[in-house]
Amino acid sequence: MTTGRMSRRECLSAAVMVPIAAMTATATITGSAQAAKNNMNGSTIGKITKFSPRLDAILDVSTPIEVIASDIQWSEGPVWVKNGNFLLFSDPPANIMRKWTPDAGVSIFLKPSGHAEPIPAGQFREPGSNGMKVGPDGKIWVADSGTRAIMKVDPVTRQRSVVVDNYKGKRFNSPNDLFFSKSGAVYFTDPPYGLTNLDESDIKEMNYNGVFRLSPDGRLDLIEAGLSRPNGLALSPDETKLYVSNSDRASPNIWVYSLDSNGLPTSRTLLRNFRKEYFDQGLAGLPDGMNIDKQGNLFASAPGGIYIFAPDGECLGLISGNPGQPLSNCCFGEKGQTLFISASHNVVRVRTKTFG
């Protein structure tokens, strides 16, 4: 593991107070449970590989990886909505948010899920919603590539409202993923992946791709501006560590930030570099979304699938899709022992021994 110490100047920029906006937007709702169901649902893909005996307490290698949804352009951002017993997941390029229930299968929850249609020509490669979490208010908080904002969605009325869409007057690039602290602060990443031409986009206003922390009182801190492609993120259960992936071919890394009592980073450590897996082994995917269980085990997507890291950093195992199939993100759901994974054109689930 490689350690690099950051100064306060490198860790933090000046904070800015951001009021919670009152804007709302509506979206077309389709309640039919027909879309995205085909004969692949119920089949299995991939495999589970054990690197350490410690994996046995978390996951059985014989557990099937079951397909629950298919025919998706690019699945992302799964979130389990406990108050309703359903899964939501994004399809960013299709501008759709879908819903899955054990009984009814898959239906369209929001369309458009991000930018209002028609989409401006030449501006967006991913106009829809991306990462999602259930907030302390019971709303679905969304890292929305299309509106270039952190949004929230009422799970009953499906009304959308803007939480924050700028830092110091400059529009976000295309928020990608988010994670809540116990206090209700939300950490989120802002790479350029939603924009056509990425960093060269004509509508990009920031000259960096940031990681931010929004406090419950509306204070917004830029906590990292030095990553080329910040993407997935997760907090350790004791909230002393923030994991952040960098989804860049040149530096495919997962970083661990040590946090102070205010939830702000003081240093960062390299958990793992995936150049070998990506370049030498040719495994599909890059460091992307992640989640964490109640014991602090990290489930992180990277070249080859979902890697499972113990709190001490040891890599315990790997959940893989079919060859050439990247896995982009994951969440725990149902009774806490099901890991839902967005897997390219599919969404799959894996039963776990651990609770998330």
From Swiss-Prot:
It catalyses: D-glucono-1,5-lactone + H2O = D-gluconate + H(+). Pathway: Carbohydrate acid metabolism; D-gluconate biosynthesis; D-gluconate from D-glucono-1,5-lactone: step 1/1. Its EC number is 3.1.1.17. GO terms for biological process: D-gluconate biosynthetic process. PROSITE patterns: TAT. One of its GO terms (cellular component) is periplasmic space. Pfam families: SGL. Its main location: periplasm. GO terms for molecular function: gluconolactonase activity. Hydrolyzes the gluconolactone formed by glucose-fructose oxidoreductase, and that formed in aerobic conditions by the glucose dehydrogenase present. Homodimer. This is Gluconolactonase. It comes from Zymomonas mobilis subsp. mobilis (strain ATCC 31821 / ZM4 / CP4). The gene is gnl.
